[in-house]
Amino acid sequence: LRELAWDFVGIEEPVSPNAFDDMRKISECTGSPIILDESCLRVDQVAALARDAERWIINVRVSKMGGLFRSLAVVQAAGQAGIPVIVGAQVGETSVLTRAALIVARAAGTNLVAQEGAFGTHLLQTDVANPVLMFGEGGILKANAYGFATASGWGLTLRPTQDFAVSLSE
């Protein structure tokens, strides 16, 4: 990795989850932080990473963390420990999880390194919500264009369930 011609933002969990000693060695050898995915799932795991915070980036996915409040707690703890975060996404997340991820990313503030997701109907045949939250040109989701600041609730309307009936013969 050191011989490649560019620097990495981070290397996502290059060994088995929770093999922190090995991940530290890789970070030391490459000079790149390790992006923790399966190795950081709960807020109580963040404090142990604080002693060498520069070695880590925590990948926060709302679905992986167990919901919005747990994700926000991890983001807050990471910020207090000086550990940057990426707000990640599962492949095929709907606009509902994209909207939740926007809340988490906003809470991360300057501690946010990157954000994934907002694939919408680029990947999904149909979405469960309107408007469909989806990135456009350059991979940018223009969140301000959706009027969330003045909308009620999350600014999404769930579509009727009959739109999602699937035939077993398909």
Positions of predicted regions on the chain:
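Flexible C-terminal active-site loop/helix
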Residues: 91-170
